[in-house]
């Protein structure tokens, strides 16, 4: 079983990994030749970069908690059950009586994968900074979040910076994935926010392109 201390000897806390983000549900065609405009069978699978990261961390045997927000809709319940079944703690997830989970529909084109999103105003993007509790950070060792959250909306952006603030106050290492999404935004403000996060990160996980 992997331990945080093996990876980061200077990490404090119990070894718990906190992953902040938005859960999504992907609809993936069983037949790679199927187009979204055609009838066919699809698989539902939990997604969102943070959800995937949390499941991977738990899969390596790490004690991992997801920090985010879900609704009372069936897709929210499915996504929450899916990450819990993979060993991810959900005690830090905020439950809302309103809002819908964001959905993504995938198709395979000759030019590559193509996603059609239904996520504007999704419940997962409505996490508020005051919904983060310091107790969650008290015994943690690492906080991880992806940079694309900074461009969803003001509420999620403020929640990200608040989470980093709580991490620093509790001597929790901050792991940051730039996760650049040019289709969301690419301007001076975005670059400024990205640089601000990078300057606070203890661990940075960029791709070769980034």
Label each PLM-derived region with a short phrase.
Residues 63-147:
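Conserved N-terminal subdomain of the carbohydrate kinase-like
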Residues 11, 136-138, 195-198:
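A short, aliphatic-rich alpha-helical micro-motif
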Residues 142, 148-210:
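Conserved beta-alpha-beta core of the PfkB/ribokinase-like small-molecule kinase fold
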Residues 32-36, 80-82, 131-132, 157-160, ...:
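Short, glycine/charged-enriched secondary-structure capping and boundary segments
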Residues 2-89:
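Glycine-rich phosphate/adenosyl-contacting loop at the front of the ribokinase-like
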Residues 20-23, 27, 70, 119-121, ...:
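Fold-independent oxyanion-binding glycine-rich loops
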Residues 2-4, 121-131, 184-189:
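Short gly/ser/thr-rich secondary-structure transition/capping motifs
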């Amino acid at each position: 079983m992997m331990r945080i201390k093996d990876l980061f000897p200077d990490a404090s806390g119990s070894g718990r990994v906190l992953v902040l983000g938005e859960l999504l549900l992907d609809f993936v065609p069983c037949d790679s030749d199927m187009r979204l405009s055609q009838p066919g069978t699809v698989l539902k699978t939990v997604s969102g970069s943070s959800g995937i990261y949390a499941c991977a961390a738990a899969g390596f045997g790490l004690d991992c908690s997801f920090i985010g927000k879900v609704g009372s809709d069936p897709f929210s319940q499915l996504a929450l059950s899916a990450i819990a079944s993979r060993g991810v703690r959900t005690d830090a997830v905020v439950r809302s009586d309103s809002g819908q989970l964001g959905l993504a529909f995938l198709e395979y084109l000759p030019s590559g994968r193509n996603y059609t999103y239904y996520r504007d105003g999704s419940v997962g993007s409505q996490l508020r900074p005051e919904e983060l509790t310091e107790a969650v950070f008290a015994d943690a060792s690492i906080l991880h979040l992806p940079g694309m959250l900074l461009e969803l909306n003001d509420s999620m952006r403020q929640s990200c910076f608040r989470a980093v603030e709580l991490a620093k106050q509790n001597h929790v290492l901050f792991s940051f994935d730039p996760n650049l999404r040019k289709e969301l935004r690419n301007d001076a403000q975005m670059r400024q926010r990205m640089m601000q996060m990078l300057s606070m990160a203890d661990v940075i996980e960029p791709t070769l392109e980034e």
